UniProtKB/Swiss-Prot annotation:
Disulfide-linked positions: none
Catalytic activity: a UDP-3-O-[(3R)-3-hydroxyacyl]-N-acetyl-alpha-D-glucosamine + H2O = a UDP-3-O-[(3R)-3-hydroxyacyl]-alpha-D-glucosamine + acetate
Database matches in HAMAP family: LpxC
Domain of life of the source: Bacteria
The protein's annotated pathway: Glycolipid biosynthesis; lipid IV(A) biosynthesis; lipid IV(A) from (3R)-3-hydroxytetradecanoyl-[acyl-carrier-protein] and UDP-N-acetyl-alpha-D-glucosamine: step 2/6
Name of the protein described by the UniProt record: UDP-3-O-acyl-N-acetylglucosamine deacetylase
GO MF entries: metal ion binding; UDP-3-O-acyl-N-acetylglucosamine deacetylase activity
Pfam families referenced in this protein's UniProt entry, alphabetically: LpxC
Organism: Nostoc sp. (strain PCC 7120 / SAG 25.82 / UTEX 2576)
């Protein structure tokens, strides 16, 4: 398979979910073999942070790459958009600590990528041929993530909440011969969601400073606070979006069936770390 990069640069500005800080992100074409990487253009010497499993620094309600003042937080939606649309190489310039949440989904990123299109590059992505040979299972209480041998790359997710509006949901999505179209229609529009009874606690914990009814679905005991939903099962589709973004830190998607149930960014990253160890 050939590698691909953007045909032209794209950009978005918005507020970060947890920091509440407004940042500007510009994504530029990058050389074949360079991968996806972030550049903190607001800092001296513009430090570079590769979008790789090895540099994950924390996974509390989002995934952060790099530590201290040079890190970049909440990278999962943007990385899912790039990976889901087939962008192997990209220079991601950001002037702050957190990727803008935008509308809470990956839809705006995907729309911009589709508008400029991709350019094929000479380097072949040999890593994309790596297959999972034996099942991998990681458990944490009743939650789990897994990767099992399969004839295609597929993502399946389950969630279970006491709130009737969410309840138990399952969804399965696979990379197809036209993954950009499938991802753009089935996964990218799904927005992040939160639970009404947790908001005050999270805010007191210094989180979700940039959260609002414009960038997150909120669910309470009486239903959704800010309907309508884009899909009846939008919450579980968003969990697949998160999983795709976190596993994209491998730099490729092995041929496997990825399964997750009531999982978290932490479990997603543990799975990616296990796969990376096996591939080496």
């Amino acid at each position: 398979m050939k590698q691909h990069t953007l045909a032209e640069a794209i950009a978005h500005t918005g507020v970060g979910l947890h920091s509440g800080v407004s940042t500007h992100v510009r994504i530029l074409p990058a050389d074949a073999g360079s991968g996806r990487y972030f550049v903190r253009v607001d800092l001296p010497d513009s430090p570079t942070i590769p979008a790789q499993v090895a540099v994950v620094s924390q996974t509390v309600l989002s995934t952060q790459l790099g530590g201290g003042e040079t890190g970049v937080r909440t990278v999962e939606h943007l990385l899912a958009a790039l990976a889901g649309m087939g962008v192997d190489n990209a220079r991601i310039e950001i002037d702050g600590p957190e990727i803008p949440l935008l509308d809470g989904s990956a839809q705006e990123w995907v729309t911009s990528i589709a508008e400029v299109g991709l350019v094929a590059q000479a380097v072949t992505n040999n890593l994309a041929s790596f297959d999972i040979q034996e099942p991998i299972w990681i458990h944490q209480d009743d939650a789990f993530v897994a990767a099992i041998p399969a004839s295609e790359t597929r993502f399946s997710y389950g969630i279970d909440f006491d709130l009737p509006a969410i309840g138990n949901q399952w969804y399965s999505w696979s990379l197809t011969t036209e993954p950009d179209t499938s991802f753009a229609q089935e996964i990218a529009p799904a927005r992040t969601f939160g639970l009404l009874h947790q908001i005050e606690y999270l805010q007191k914990s210094g989180l979700i400073k940039g959260g609002s009814l414009d960038n997150a679905l909120i669910c309470g005991p009486d239903g959704w606070v800010n309907p309508p939903l884009r899909f009846a099962n939008e919450p579980v589709r968003h969990k697949i979006l998160d999983l795709v973004g976190d596993l994209s830190l491998l730099g490729y998607f092995p041929r496997a069936h990825f399964l997750a149930y009531k999982a978290s960014h932490n479990l997603h990253i543990q799975l990616a770390q296990r796969i990376l160890a096996l591939s080496n």
